[in-house]
């Protein structure tokens, strides 16, 4: 009796909890982290006349969401990366208004910590992927859209791409191709939602020229709005 009780208590220890991190929770962690970083870059964009407070609210919600999803899960690598992101965020928020030249020194290590968090979450996800192929397709599609949005928002910070983001001339077209293929695959795997998926693809296609053509006018708010609509609805479909 005592042995059985001991085993139960051991299984409840936080250090063992990471084994129970589900594919869905890991996906949610990754989406919240991407959304937090993209909205942070949109809010601190040095090329805008005035920061949009909606991005401030959204990035804070995203960071809070990551913390909530990690609470009690017991994976040290995820927790350390999230703590580093939070620490760098606090440093960034203490920068006096108007001193935009100080942003990169805070944002670069924050995005590096995000990359570590995402890499670790991807490792855990690969070890226990979802059982249904359509859920796997949906997860990949959502993450590809979030990656593309983060790349777009990072263009306002020329030095960030050099130090943090592993990109070349083919990265954006490749992501765009994966996104279109993801919509096609998901519609085939989930015919009951094909009409709604077509509408979401229309939202993506509407903002797509701005994302792919760097000579077009800069629209960080519109990019966040339209792509955010797509990923939010995909997450809702995922939860149904």
Language-model features, listed with the residues they occupy:
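Sec-dependent signal peptide recognition
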Residues: 2-9
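N-terminal signal peptide c-region/cleavage motif recognized by signal peptidases
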Residues: 14-18
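Short, recurring structural edge motifs at helix starts
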Residues: 20-24, 126-129
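N-terminal extracytoplasmic segments of bacterial inner-membrane proteins
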Residues: 24-51, 133-161, 224, 228-236
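Extended amphipathic alpha-helical interaction segments
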Residues: 103-198
